């Protein structure tokens, strides 16, 4: 089940703070820093990014990705 609680997405028992960016220029580290700050330690920070005429990409820390695989 997926639920949206304010800026927090809850899916499969895990909470994610999703930061969406739609821009031609993209700084992954700056976007991740913003997501980490906004998540405030209560959720896994995730950044979604899209450029014009390109598919969406998802950026997350490796340690968080590996935890999802467990």
List the predicted regions and their residue ranges.
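Catalytic centers of nucleases
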Residues: 1-38
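Domain-level recognition of nuclease-like catalytic cores that cleave nucleotide substrates
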Residues: 44-70
């Amino acid at each position: 089940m997926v639920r949206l609680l304010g800026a927090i997405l809850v899916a499969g028992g895990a909470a994610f703070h999703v930061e969406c960016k739609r821009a031609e220029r993209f700084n992954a580290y700056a976007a991740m820093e913003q997501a980490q700050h906004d998540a405030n330690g209560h959720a896994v920070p995730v950044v979604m990014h899209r450029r014009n005429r390109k598919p969406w990409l998802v950026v997350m820390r490796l340690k968080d990705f590996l935890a999802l695989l467990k």
